[in-house]
A protein has these predicted regions:
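Extended recognition/assembly regions associated with phosphoester-bond processing machinery
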Residues: 1-388
Length: 388
């Protein structure tokens, strides 16, 4: 690809050169590659070059022309099996209450974000979130909703990390004294998060996902946060009321009403951002749908997306079709339901969710595991519940 970044282009960070948002060009081409070699694909066929990215597992049907270019007649992506008939399994250790059928998603808590000191709205929203979970000082309608929450899942950046720290491995520089200040800020932010989660996980089961953003040198898939960061929560961690989970996060939750499980898949969103950078896709939900169609969460890895060098098995290759697929979003809430092919020619509905940024919108998302309905809840000055 003409615009693919290199180590030399990385010097743009040092000299303040404007950042390129899209690494695509009208002259980009497609090639089919396997262990035997590489051949160029005729893009005059019904193929949009810039809707593909490097690394997609795909089979092409066609033939070589006299110019040694492969003319495509048909193509097929990796087939993801649907194991939705597996024995139901719930991620909770204890027996859930019969009426608990809601999962609350909170994306980008961003504790310590500088904007908080200006108006205090984010801190107020976090306090209101605790009141909601504790069933404290809320009306009966919200109280009934709160009592039905089965689990709270924190996605994305739960603590704020200064951009100066994030870009140290990209050629940027920072003064030693500034680095010490920012490092202390991060430690203080994690201490605040520890205390906050100690309150929340005392009332409801909590899953805390990790995030690549703000973690330089971190590779995908990402291990859970270390327990040493949450000393106030050791008892809750041992009791499984606070779960430090990996990224991507894959789990099943049992529906008492349906007498079966729902399969969930979520990431912090960096894999989706990478796909949009290297393709003409501009909407996260479309990029998410593409990863399901391609059967791979991050086909660009390791070319332009850092992952561990696995040799025996690709952990980012999908082996099941999720009922719900979510990512940490940067803006407001977006969702849609798509239809995927399942084994035996059956169809399966999949709910896609780009979660709202809590630190700027003060919104969380409630997902009903019984009927797949979605509702927004606003933790601003006036706690409100809106059907999506």
């Amino acid at each position: 690809m003409k615009l693919k970044p290199s180590c030399l282009k990385g010097m743009e960070n040092m000299y303040g050169i404007s950042k390129i948002e899209k690494f695509i060009d009208e002259k980009d081409s497609l090639s089919l590659e396997d262990s035997s070699g590489r051949v160029k694909i005729d893009t005059k066929s019904d193929i949009n070059v810039n809707e593909f990215v490097t690394g997609i597992p795909v089979a092409f049907k066609g033939q070589l022309n006299n110019k040694e270019i492969f003319v495509v007649n048909d193509y097929l992506f990796y087939s993801v099996e649907d194991n939705s008939t597996n024995t139901p399994m719930d991620i909770e250790m204890n027996t859930p209450k019969e009426n608990q059928n809601l999962i609350l998603f909170i994306s980008n808590l961003n504790i310590g974000k500088p904007e908080e000191s200006k108006n205090g709205l984010a801190e107020s929203a976090r306090t209101m979130l605790i009141d909601f979970i504790q069933n404290n000082n809320i009306n009966k309608n919200l109280s009934d909703i709160s009592s039905r929450i089965k689990r709270v899942i924190f996605v994305g950046s739960s603590v704020y990390v200064n951009q100066k720290i994030e870009e140290l491995d990209k050629g940027s520089y920072i003064k030693a004294e500034d680095y010490k200040i920012e490092l202390n800020n991060i430690i203080n932010n994690f201490t605040s998060l520890d205390k906050y989660l100690n309150i929340v996980s005392s009332y409801v089961h909590v899953d805390l996902m990790n995030s690549i953003e703000g973690n330089d040198g971190v590779y995908f898939p990402q291990n859970p946060n270390g327990q040493f960061l949450f000393l106030d929560n050791i008892r809750n961690i041992n009791a499984k009321t606070l779960n430090l989970v990996e990224n991507p996060y894959i789990f099943d939750i049992y529906s008492n009403k349906l007498k079966t499980k729902k399969y969930f898949l979520g990431t912090s969103g960096e894999n989706i951002n990478c796909i949009m950078q290297y393709s003409s896709i501009n909407e996260p939900l479309i990029a998410m749908q593409k990863t399901l169609e391609w059967g791979h969460l991050a086909p660009l890895a390791p070319d332009t997306f850092r992952i561990y060098p696995f040799t025996d098995k690709d952990p980012l290759l999908l082996d099941r079709i999720p009922d719900m697929y979510f990512i940490s979003g940067k803006n407001d809430f977006n969702s849609k339901v798509i239809e995927m092919n399942a084994d035996g020619g059956n169809k399966k509905n999949v709910t896609l969710m780009e979660l709202p940024d809590f630190s700027s919108t003060f919104k969380g998302i409630l997902f009903n595991i019984d009927d797949d309905s979605i509702n927004e809840i606003n933790f601003s000055q006036d706690l409100s519940f809106n059907k999506s």
